[in-house]
Amino acid sequence: MVKVIASSVRKGNVLDVDGKLYVVLTAANFHPGKGTPVTQVDMRRIVDGVKVSERWRTTEQVERAFVEDVNFQYLYEDGEGFHFMNPVSYDQVVVDVETMGDQKAFLQEGMTCVLSMHEGIALALQLPRHVTLEIAETEPVVKGQTASSSYKPAILSNGVRTLVPPHINAGTRVVIATEDVSYVERAKD
């Protein structure tokens, strides 16, 4: 464990508070006109998923847990959760549905992801910045609708909705940014 000042806590950090591990969801520093500056932190307890809000003076010491980011390859999903394998040591890790969150829609078999590990437990998952998916369904283009840079709604092969340029049709493979589900470019494969 490393002691850090509260004002240096950022989203994604893992903190040890009273012997329990928490993942930081949001952290904001407030400097009121009167009084001492404070850091407001919203966290999720790793063990049971309970959300907690804490307020510390910005100079107060908090314990940050050691977290290691390791590359893992996605294998499959079953009733236990999502199975990943370390391509170097061949160790397998199961990630639960709560840790996975909304990112599960973008998982593809064999995809390399970064898992944040603490004592053999996966705390968080980072997908690649871009994934290539096929357009399953999109609306036809309305002729003459070129006055503004128009995008049309589309449904990807994984069921996620996004906006694509008018020249993209169903069956076209496109590159999508996983962070905000936005269209990047037409796939070059």
From Swiss-Prot:
- Where in the cell does this protein reside? Cytoplasm
SMART domains, alphabetized: EFP, Elong-fact-P_C
Q: Gene3D superfamilies, from UniProt?
A: 2.30.30.30, Nucleic acid-binding proteins
Q: Which gene encodes it?
A: efp
What is the protein name for this chain?
Elongation factor P
Q: Which family does it belong to?
A: Belongs to the elongation factor P family.
Q: Which GO terms describe its molecular function?
A: translation elongation factor activity
The pathway is:
Protein biosynthesis; polypeptide chain elongation
Q: Which InterPro entries match?
A: Elong-fact-P_C (IPR015365), NA-bd_OB-fold (IPR012340), Rib_uL2_dom2 (IPR014722), Transl_elong_fac_P/YeiP (IPR020599), Transl_elong_KOW-like (IPR013185), Transl_elong_P/YeiP_cen (IPR001059), Transl_elong_P/YeiP_CS (IPR013852), Transl_elongation_fac_P (IPR011768)
**According to the entry, what is the taxonomic lineage of the organism?**
Bacteria, Pseudomonadati, Pseudomonadota, Alphaproteobacteria, Hyphomicrobiales
Task: Give the GO terms filed under biological process for this record.
Answer: peptide biosynthetic process
Chief location of this protein within or outside the cell = cytoplasm
Signal as a keyword?
no
**Cellular component terms per the entry's GO annotation:** cytoplasm
- Record has Acetylation as a keyword: no
